[in-house]
Amino acid sequence: MITVSNLAIQFGKKPLFQDVNLKFTPGNCYGVIGANGAGKSTMLRLISGDLASTKGSVTLGPGERLSVLKQNHYDYEESTVLNAVLMGHIELWNIIQEKDTLYAKADFSDKDGMRAAELEERFAEMDGWNAESDAAMLLSGLGIKEDYHHRLMKELGGKEKVRVLLAQALFGKPDNLLLDEPTNDLDLDTVMWLENYLGNYENTVLVVSHDRHFLDAVSTHTVDIDFGKVQLFAGNYSFWYHSSQLALRQQQNQNKKAEEKKKELLEFIARFSANVAKSKQTTSRKKMIEKLNIEDIQPSTRKYPGIIFMPDREPGNRILEVKGLTKSINGEVLFKNLDFNIEKDDKVIFLSRDPRAMTALFEIITGHEKPDAGTYFWGQTITNAYLPMDNSDFFNSDLNLVDWLGQFSSDTSENYIRGYLGKMLFSGEEIYKKTTVLSGGEKMRCMISRMMLRNANVLVLDTPTNHLDLESIQAFNNTLTNFKGNVLMSSHDHEFIQTIASRVIELAPKGMIDKITEYDEYIANEELKDRRNKIY
């Protein structure tokens, strides 16, 4: 259990939030949401003690352990993968280390024996005999193969290190668990494993995530950080979203009616204020105005970008034809002999256990890479716009945003470019910001602006929700759902896929599967599960 009392944090003269009083109880998972910069990660750091509060306190239940998903991937370079996970339970790890040191002594004394007995008792109480198997189970569930368990952390890639640190946070089933963006760099299958794990977790969990499906699957409550306030709501993200939208509409309607009534009363007063016979009625109406309740609706810190794709022309019946496409990297086959046709109105999610397969396919069909074998043909009516996963090559110049976006526009007037930047929430002096100082989310919004300028009828999107906040993802999602062209995409966002894609194509070294179906139906189909395993 975590109790937050009168908590406040201030940076300089600006308070981020204040007077926060919350209680987080066992058996519940709290999804922490808010716009970028609202203070989600700061809240977790305050609770963990990594950041000192300006005022207030955070207390845990007596004897309880708190575990945090660490963000520094290079802290354990000289440790084995398995040991890095065991270090997640620091008391148990220290006991293991002290035991090993004692038993390695050449002059093992009676005093050492007594200390060893104490350690063994505590070790057994903490289920130490199952520690390594429990750690291995977590690693396997998170997609780290057994071959890697005894390798050094420095031998792993960045995405694998993220998974090890997640296993470390989960290890030993801590009483209180803080997870900041735990689904980053996880594939869809691993996210599903984590959803199931947290869904059955009996202790207290706080999680920050931009994955709506994940939040809905694991959260029993929602912590909303907005207006500089921190509020707790029962229910998951979708319940909070629909409830808050309904409450806002109701307040707006109530205010509208009150404003109309006020106008009507003021008109009566203006008309009859000089009429002595109507003096009682005008006085009565003045009192009625005083009683009218018109509440201020505070502007939210949440901002939804205006993502709009307007194709110059309607696509014809021939969209894309792929024949015998094959691609390998360093002798490793990503896909072989791909054959498929994209039909009009298709919105396709491409899947693979190796994310390099989707990136390679998209790079080939957009002309940025060559296949090892095979061909592809775009229809004559087709214009495509590509959103690559790695956009670093687009931002290696020292241009400001206006000049940067102007490179991709036939109309380079500042007002025209400013309009597109404004749609993606760049306003005022921000449009003169240098591209070299942009955050990941800002770069992604620039890339989407670039796509909008293309007026394309086919959108090719490689993990398009990377670095975007919930509001941008929601806006992107809504636009693609209603888009009147074709969408070819990869994604790790379950909700994004489920609400957009009408067709699934899975790529693998030994074959492919092509189904016109929704994503949820595809992954639930038992017959397809066998077929999917056979193509890898």
PLM regions: where:
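A structural signal for long alpha-helical coiled-coils and helix-turn connectors
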Residues: Y103, Y241, A270-S273, A277, ...
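ABC ATPase nucleotide-binding domains
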Residues: Q251-S273, K278-K287, K303, A524-Y536
